[in-house]
């Protein structure tokens, strides 16, 4: 079993020293969903939500959050992100919105947390902007889908089994 890199020999939390790691291109893709009543999805898609453009604001919130990940998660390194892309897509089968975020950098540590933070905050923003219409919305399935670059190599998540 792999050891926890953020815990030292005495069991104390620490920021990992990445000084000796080579800078490589790193990319991560994460996803999440906001399930809601069909009428709420219809309201969002119509552009008539009281707080405005739910999907557009959620995209911007996700991008902004990715850039501030190191301020939100105590042991994350501040990264110079070269790309953050957040997509919010309607899913009538859910019903709700499917959110994906892709983060990219060239550096000494990965961007998984930035992609996950972008998805999380985008989903929270959707909830905040539509909660007046539907307090029963559910944020679901936030997970890392794929990562590449770095010493640990490539990772691709298995399809969900639910």
Curated annotation (Swiss-Prot):
Keywords: Lyase, Molybdenum cofactor biosynthesis
Gene behind the chain: moaC
Keyword Cytoplasm in record: no
Keyword Aminoacyl-tRNA synthetase: no
Catalytic activity from the UniProt record: (8S)-3',8-cyclo-7,8-dihydroguanosine 5'-triphosphate = cyclic pyranopterin phosphate + diphosphate
UniProt protein name: Cyclic pyranopterin monophosphate synthase
Family under the similarity heading: Belongs to the MoaC family.
Active site (UniProt): 128
One MF annotation (Gene Ontology) recorded for this entry: cyclic pyranopterin monophosphate synthase activity
UniProt cross-references to Pfam families, sorted A to Z: MoaC (PF01967)
Organism, as annotated: Xanthobacter autotrophicus (strain ATCC BAA-1158 / Py2)
An individual GO BP term: Mo-molybdopterin cofactor biosynthetic process
